[in-house]
């Protein structure tokens, strides 16, 4: 799970926003050009690729339902840091957040030209080269992530020029590109963190540190009534005194996957029975988080590589359903 919105990035953007205080960026109709980003050249030359064989804390399946996870091949994974995988329901398009190195200061990520969201297409022989997803006007600063797609709408979180702090935005897929980005206008009192909206558009699941929870982050759900998200309800049956967040709900609404941090991040799953979420079960650990599933039930997620409490790299892994 990425941590891209640090105080330094917000400070930089707050300075940029001073001249535009009280304003917001109107939606674009003319998308910016999308030159091929040279993300590989931005990776530090001394970066060393970590493999399952050299991983100090290899991630394992905790059940017989899934095989042990394995990393996706290049070009999805590199010696840089890949995070926040989101698989489209067709099982063919994979969105991934990339930065050249987890050690790069966030204020440099903001302006490096390559940190951001990329899309890969699954082919018969592997994965396509990445397509950079541009969600800001040329020449304006933004640090985008947390991508979630439903239909032709993308929700993404962003710290960007013209705004104070982090906000949720939406963009529409039109004429082969993402454009028309605008503020998502969630009720600020809800404190919406990373989110997932059910396939029918009726429920918004998200994590938040808002009052009334059990841990630092708790899972919450809000109902959509006539286009308005209602007061969130705490998912008491799923939450713990640990960090619980980064929800993902399967297309049929029968499973809710989330990340629980118990020393290190772990992936947990709850099944819905008779309309209620059952006690969650640990599925993958350690350093496993932010799940997304394809139509076959295979799980894509982020695995971080640590040594002596220092994060060296991050990759996207997949666990195949048996």
Regions picked out by a protein language model, each given a short descriptive name:
Residues 31-322:
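Short, conserved micro-motifs composed of acidic
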Residues 1-4:
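Positively charged n-region of N-terminal signal peptides that target proteins for export
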Residues 24-32:
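Ser/Thr/Pro/Gly-rich low-complexity linker/stalk segments immediately outside membranes or between
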Residues 19-21:
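Bacterial signal peptide processing site
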Residues 15-17:
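C-terminal motif of bacterial Sec signal peptides marking the signal peptidase cleavage site
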